[in-house]
Structures are given as C-alpha cells and as structure tokens.
Amino acid sequence: MNKPLFLLLCAISTTAFAQKFEGLALTPPMGWNSWNTFAANINEALIKETADAMIANGMRDAGYNYIVIDDCWESKERDAKGNLVPDPVKFPNGLKAVGDYLHSKGFKFGIHSCAGTRTCADFPGGRGHEYQDALSYASWGVDFLKYDWCNHGTADARETYKTMRDALHAAGRPVLFSLCEWGQNKPWEWAADVGHMWRTTGDIYDSYDGRKGWEMGWKRILDLQYSLVDGNGPDCIGKFAGPGHWNDPDMLEVGNEGLTFAESRAHFSLWCMIAAPLMAGNDVRHMKPEYRDMMTNKAVLAIDQDALGKQGYRALAEPHNNIEIWVKELSNGEWAVCALNTSMKAEELTVRWDRLWTIQGEFAVHNVWTNQPAGDTTKSYTAKVDSHDVLLFRLTPAKK
C-alpha cells in the first residue's frame, strides 16, 4: 500500500472511532462505583453480586448501566512485558470474565487507572503505558475508564489526558472517558474534547457539609461550584456542561450511614438539578427500600437525564430564611426548581415564583417527590421541610 493511501485510511479510521466516542454520554452517565463503600475490599464475587442486586432492585432498568471497579483491582506490578495484571486473588478469572458477566446482564463495564506512574493506592499507573493499557482495556471489554491524577509529577494535565484519549481512540473500542483530575487545572475549560466527564473538586464523603482532610460533604462540594468560575446563575460553571461532556461533582453518597434520609434525598435531588453523573456509591446488595425507591424515582431521574442537557444553578440564597433555591431549564419550555432547607431543624419554606427571574410566564407546578399537583406560579408555595431536606418541583407551561 502506498504511504499517502495508508495515511488517509488511518485518518478515516481515527475519525470513525472519534465519532463513536462523541456519541457517548449524551445525558449524564449513570451507574455504580465500588470506591465509596468498599475501597480496596473488592473482588469478582462482589462485582457479580452487585450486578445481580441492581437487576433485582430495578436500578439497571432505571438507567444505572455502568458498573465501575475503582482502584485496587491490580497486582502491585506489571508483568515482564509491561502489561497490567489483575490481582489473581481478587479476580482469579481475570477482568475479561468480569466484563463478559456484566455485558451478559445488560451492563457496561468500567475500570479505574491513573494518569501518574502509580495510582492513588500505589498500584501501577498509566503514564508511559497509555497505548498498551488501552489495548488491554479493549481486550477485556471495558466501556468506561475513570482516570485519576495521583503521582503525576510535573506532567501537564491537558496533554496527559489527551494522550490517554488518543490511546483509547487508537484501541478502537468506544470508552466513556472520565477525568478524575479534581478540578486542579480547570478541566471544564478544556476537557470537552478530551473526555465525557471531569471532576470539579476533591473527594466526597457521607456528610452534609463536613470536611475530613481531602474529603468534603456533599453540600460543601455543591457550594464550591460557585467559587470555581467567575459568574453567577447560568453564567457559572454550568455553561461548560452539556450533552457528551459533564461537570462531575463526584459520586453519590445516598444511603450511606453518615447522611440522614433527608440529607440523602436532598443530595440526590441537587445532583439531578446540576445534571451530574449519577454513580451510586452504596452497598446496593443491602439497600433499604426507601433508598431504592429514591434512586429509581423516574420523575426525579428525568430531571437529571433531560435531553436539553442544561446544568441547574443556584437562583436564590437566603441564609437568614434558611433557604436556597436552585433552578434547571428543561426541554419543552419546562423547569425544575429545588428548595433546600439549610437549617439544622425543620423549617417552613416559602417559594415565591416571582423572585425566580429566569423563569418567565405562568406555569403549573407539580411536587415531584410527593407526585402531587402544587398549584401554579401565580401563588407562592409554603410547606414545612425537615432539616437539610428539599422541596422538588417540575414546572409545565400553563395551558392557555
């Protein structure tokens, strides 16, 4: 084959693979990740049991279709040829067998690695092995790669993540690429053509607004979104998100013991309001029915998964009234509105629709969590709300 023709065919092939990648994550990705609950305590049996549980409890059919094995799945060193090796005790049948099982159950298979020389838990990282590792992932049937940012030395974040993106393209298997760079190099400004989602902050843990070293409660992470980018409302960090590329405020802590039921519901509601990827982080094998019902609520998930792809924003914050109001533009002229009680005790919250200046016109109001009509926007709405709980509404244009 002559050289110009060969180069042309390579370019066509690369373009075709890139198009397959661009067709992923048109709505925020949904799934489950092992880290928040299990950390290093993972194995083949756990992953299979999790998949089976997500079928039985309705999570798979609700859209949670990625199952992601986080850090600590590897052996401590590569083999003599430089290949990654799954831990033979945790995964005695290798990772292709795990991927095959997940695919047979209707899931997609996700895995973790790191842009540095070692992962955050001190296993082999991807730096210098990107193309080799991408081929391994493809051979195992990997559909999702979470790529962390530990032990990166002086590496440039944008170029490092682009290298892994190019390696995934070259391997030929469409992989949803999740950049876990913690927002240190403002990935929202450059990552839309590199990956499908990017972390905006450090790690979450199961707390409302606590801080534990590197980890933060979900409300603290939510508040941080407003210090990352100059601007307010729709001009804040949400302007960088949309179909195929999403701001990622980290995984869900819904159902974990550090949160009350109300705090879990508020956490879930507000992640849906900001069009966040919804990666469950609890032990779904032993989930209480009320958390199952929360995480599979179709009306709430529809807010997160709305095809318009707009990220919601804080429209009103009144600490003296213990209220924050978040709004999210939806398809077909509809809106979602979420009112959070920031008080340490139950409070009466009043939503005055005329104060939400971006929502113009008259709307019918539906209370999403109670699945009941809640009047219209010509009259304010008042209800008693538990500490750190929410009111969640969907607004539909009033019929003339």
Residue positions per predicted region:
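Carbohydrate-binding surface patches
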Residues: W271-I274, M279-G281, P319-I359
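Sec-dependent N-terminal signal peptides
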Residues: P4-S13
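Glycan-recognition surfaces
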Residues: Q132, L176-N282
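Catalytic cores of secreted or luminal carbohydrate-active enzymes
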Residues: A266-L316
